């Protein structure tokens, strides 16, 4: 599979995209299941961590620290962020807006810190569900994009892949080395969503 993807990338990214769709790989659409919550309590929780109008990177770290989660190494944080999606709006890595945080509370059916803690086991179980993990993986691409961008830089991609897929991909080191060599030669300068998504399916 690695050889196939390398061959496709060496030819043309368009061919990789054609392969992606020809094999009936379907993109998943997130369907939020909204649960009634005490929105006043949820807003109070947001206010506890917000800095200005958003929960910024430092405060996001504090939020997950209070949940007993290491934000730097535990990918369950991506699953929580995945559940904070607001329709037609792209989340920004390292911050949660009020709208996103409250949406996450509604989607998970929680309105306080204890409720969030109670969902950790569920989020970990979702990481073991292939379909949910795939949805989360695809979400991370947009999550990692800078505002207004439709691609991510190579350094970000090669940092995220081992974290997300290290336990699933036997050839991760070779893949990362290949991408880094391509980047050093200026043969690739960005990572597109199509290649990001295709890599997941080849890993499977």
Describe the function of each predicted region:
Residues 147-149:
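Conserved active-site beta-strand-loop modules that form the wall/rim of enzyme catalytic pockets
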Residues 1-121, 128-131, 152-155, 159-203:
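Short, amphipathic alpha-helical interaction segments embedded in low-complexity terminal/linker regions
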Residues 122-145:
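Conserved, structured regulatory domains from eukaryotic proteins
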């Amino acid at each position: 599979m690695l050889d196939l993807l390398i061959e496709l990338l060496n030819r043309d990214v368009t061919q990789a995209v054609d392969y992606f769709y020809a094999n009936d790989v379907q993109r998943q659409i997130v369907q939020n299941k909204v649960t009634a919550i005490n929105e006043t309590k949820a807003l109070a929780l947001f206010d506890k961590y917000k800095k200005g109008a958003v929960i910024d990177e430092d405060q996001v770290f504090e939020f997950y620290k209070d949940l007993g989660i290491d934000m730097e190494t535990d990918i369950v944080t991506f699953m929580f962020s995945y559940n904070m999606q607001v329709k037609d709006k792209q989340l920004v890595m390292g911050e949660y807006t009020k709208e996103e945080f409250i949406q996450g509370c509604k989607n998970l059916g929680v309105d306080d810190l204890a409720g969030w803690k109670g969902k950790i086991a569920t989020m970990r179980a979702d990481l073991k569900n292939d379909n949910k993990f795939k949805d989360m993986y695809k979400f991370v691409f947009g999550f990692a994009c800078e505002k207004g961008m439709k691609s991510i830089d190579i350094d970000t991609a090669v940092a995220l892949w081992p974290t997300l897929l290290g336990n699933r991909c036997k050839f991760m080191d070779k893949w990362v080395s290949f991408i880094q060599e391509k980047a050093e030669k200026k043969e690739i300068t960005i990572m597109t969503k199509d290649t990001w998504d295709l890599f997941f399916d080849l890993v499977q």
